[in-house]
A protein has these predicted regions:
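Local sequence-structure signature of Cys/Sec-based thiol-disulfide redox active-site neighborhoods
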Residues: 1-31
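Amphipathic alpha-helical interface surfaces
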Residues: 16, 37-40, 75
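Short, glycine/charged-enriched secondary-structure capping and boundary segments
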Residues: 18-20, 43, 79-80
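Thiol-based oxidoreductase modules, predominantly thioredoxin-like and allied folds used
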Residues: 25-48
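A polyampholytic, Gly/Pro-enriched intrinsically disordered region
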Residues: 48-54
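Thiol/disulfide oxidoreductase modules built on the thioredoxin-like
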Residues: 54-61
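A short, hydrophobic beta-strand/beta-hairpin element that forms part of a small beta-sheet core
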Residues: 61-73
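C-terminal cap of thioredoxin/glutaredoxin-like
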Residues: 70-95
Length: 96
């Protein structure tokens, strides 16, 4: 399953949510709905090499696609092109 981190108020996430909201192989996680989801995403963003430029620019880094092996694509364009950046394993459910 691929986790997709999005946020309701994010204009870049609108198309992603429309495309993947009803597909069982994808888990859409709205980081604005629960503190636990936000903490999970921030832990990933603060430590994964895929977010280096995102952090430098002061951006958030969503939408974000995370495969089970921990590799990440930070845009729909990169996801569609299969451009994932390897890194640390995926953050486990409930990790802080």
């Amino acid at each position: 399953m691929i986790k997709i981190y999005v946020m309701e108020s994010c204009p870049d996430c609108t198309e992603v949510k429309a495309l993947y909201s009803n597909h069982p192989e994808y888990e859409l996680i709205d980081i604005g709905r629960q503190a636990r989801s936000l903490k999970e995403f921030l832990a990933l963003r603060d430590h994964h090499p895929a977010f280096e430029k995102v952090r430098q620019r002061g951006n958030i880094g969503i939408p974000c696609f995370v495969r089970e092996d921990g590799s990440i694509a930070i845009s729909l364009k990169h996801f569609d092109a299969g451009r994932f950046i390897e890194g640390t394993p995926a953050i486990q459910e409930g990790a802080s």
